[in-house]
Design a protein with these regions (language model features):
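Iron-sulfur cluster-binding electron-transfer modules in prokaryotic oxidoreductases
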Residues: 5-9, 14, 63-67, 77-329
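Ferredoxin-type iron-sulfur electron-transfer modules and their immediate structural context
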Residues: 1-66
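C-type cytochrome heme c attachment motif
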Residues: 26-27, 68-78
Length: 329
């Protein structure tokens, strides 16, 4: 890896993809939205691999595919080798940014990131919830108080935007303040970020499922709502949490939620992850519109800030599961 030596430790992962006959090509939401060989997992990994080896010049055209990934892990789960494509492409982003390459939108994220000192809080709601979905943020704080009593809120960002935009060093430095702590997270992407930093994390939806008898049995909304559960990529394939939200929804709705045809380990991405709404907005929109069409008009309930925002931008009626939990306590 003479051109990008920082990717040497990922050599095996890259070569596993490069020499594979593209068996996971149908798993990627980005290349399904824009059918190009460059955008399938093989193409993205190949572009970074050949750039790292010096076989192609370090140019934007070869760097850009590294950002054509939502981090949904669908290709990993479809792979016989369980190859970590998402993690490898994040390291590729870091290598390209170090060499002055990367999408303009990604550079703006890095320029605008303002490091915050941790407030030492136990409840990590997430920046997207705080900024874009304040009603859910308030519901999360209310839920935590009802379940556990007074809970301090962590106001600092988890640092995930740094990792997604291509600054691994700043991400790791920022994350040191979370190491060794016990935290409850609302957004699964934030949970994975602080977990990688060494925090012990549980999800608020998990804690609600553990105290299921504290939730009033539904329906508490007149029974008129048809709700279809969407498994967020980071909650499901990332953290392996599938049962807790279904336990909670069955309790508060008075019946099991509707399901997408592709669910649990095979659930499909909302298009909201990996900075895709910023770096490839058209592809992100297409992915979200397909998921909304798959919902057949039912209200979508999920547990991920970026998914809520993506689905709403595509015209869907969307509820975050935290608001249902709060209403049932």
């Amino acid at each position: 890896m003479r051109a990008l030596p920082m990717l040497e430790e990922r050599r095996h992962a890259f070569e596993t993809c490069v020499y594979c006959p593209k068996l996971c090509r149908s798993a990627c939401p980005v290349s399904n939205a824009e059918p190009r060989e460059t955008l399938i997992p093989w193409g993205k990994m190949s572009s970074s691999y050949f750039a790292a080896r010096g076989d192609v010049p370090l140019e934007e055209s070869f760097a850009k595919p590294a950002w054509a990934c939502t981090g949904c892990h669908a290709c990993r789960d479809a792979c016989d080798h369980k190859n970590d494509v998402a993690g490898s492409l994040l390291d590729a982003r870091d290598a390209f940014v170090t060499n002055g390459l990367g999408p303009a939108a990604s550079k703006r994220v890095l320029d605008r990131f303002s490091p915050e000192k941790s407030t030492g809080g136990a409840l990590l709601v997430g920046c997207l919830y705080d900024r874009k979905l304040p009603d859910v943020s308030r519901a999360a704080a209310s839920t935590a108080k009802k379940l556990f009593g007074d809970v301090s809120i962590e106001r600092a960002c988890c640092g995930l935007p740094l990792r997604l935009a291509g600054d691994k060093k700043r991400f790791e430095e920022h994350g040191k303040q979370f190491a060794g702590r016990d935290m409850i997270a609302v957004d699964p992407g934030c949970a994975m970020a602080v977990r990688d930093a060494g925090a012990r994390v549980t999800m608020l939806v998990e804690r609600a499922a553990e105290r299921i008898t504290s939730l009033r049995e539904g329906p508490n909304d007149g029974g008129a709502r048809e709700m279809r559960w969407h498994d967020p990529c980071q909650l499901g394939r990332g953290l392996g949490i599938y049962e807790a939200p279904r336990i909670v929804l069955t309790r508060v709705l008075g019946r099991a939620p509707l399901e997408f045809a592709m669910r649990r380990e095979r659930a499909e991405c909302s298009g909201g992850g990996g900075l895709l709404p910023l770096t490839m907005p058209d592809n992100s929109r297409t992915i979200a519109e397909k998921r909304v069409a798959d919902s057949s008009g039912a209200e979508i309930v999920t547990a991920c800030a970026s998914s809520v925002l993506r689905f709403r931008s595509a015209g869907a009626q969307v509820t975050d599961i935290v608001t249902l939990i709060d209403a049932a306590l």
